[in-house]
């Protein structure tokens, strides 16, 4: 189905810079997200028909569309995030390419281009309307496509009371891209049986497995002396960091793994001979494998300290989120419904693990099972990001189908 306001909603949202800041100590991490929620989303939520609309100190804008059929007793939530990734988001100037011809798309005057030779996903979209960047910013389809789709679904249901639906709760939240947005989510206030994050990629994505995730911060303490007299005295902290890294499995890196394979990812190294710090992220799907990865890092640190004769390697491990499959597989109702709705719409569900996490990873462990459904974005987090308007329309169809489902 086509929705005349969907594109306008989306273009309005992406033009607002809501980039999050991992170094901030506030919630939300940037004032622009507060302004976007209170000045753009809250008025829009009221206009499209949501009731009891409010903004919480945790950064979430919340609203409700009451059920219009007493036989539909479920309460279902839909959640998308306001922030965008760590890439230029100031001055987003979207290009709307109607009836895409399958060829190269010039991204404004930037000199960058979307070429099917480089981005095979473009081969799916001839004849469709694509929204791209102008090459100077990201687009923000992650996750403003989700916000636009939820808003459009509510708008359509309000205008078409003949479509019977259950109670719907909507939540637009902050800071998903920096991994802290759902930390303060109020599950008791949201009060639904289950929810969906509308934060996936291409048409048909339906996901209920995520990584389990941890961060590892390492400190290597060296001893700096003049290199001319260093023998037997110098301890090079940079070399300690190299030695530690070389003891990790060389093939367990993001660029060499796929599917259900986990990894260690060296994110950052800074330092000198005297003192060096390294940051890793650890990812795996199975709980035992996840715990084994953390234990392996600790074992390497302990072994190095034993060989060095002092505690020169300090490891601090912090769990970040867990595989939501552990919660959702206890009651697959949200998956069963979404899968049935997609199939009824002629959409082939793509049920694959997320090699990452969503707000749903944390919200599921707060008592609200929250799988993820497609929002349409491709090449997210950079200048080559784009989205198909037709895929966004199908996401709206899916949301409407879920809340009207009577099975």
UniProtKB/Swiss-Prot annotation:
Active site: 83, 176
KW Iron (keyword) present: no
InterPro entries in the record: ArgE/DapE_CS, Bact_exopeptidase_dim_dom, Peptidase_M20, Peptidase_M20_dimer, Peptidase_M20B
Any coiled-coil regions, as ranges: none
CDD domains found in the cross-reference section: M20_peptT (cd03892)
UniProt keyword Hydrolase present: yes
Residues that hold Zn(2+) 1 according to the record: 81, 142, 199
GO cellular component, one term: cytosol
Function: Cleaves the N-terminal amino acid of tripeptides.
Protein name, per record: Peptidase T
Organism: Streptococcus pneumoniae (strain Taiwan19F-14)
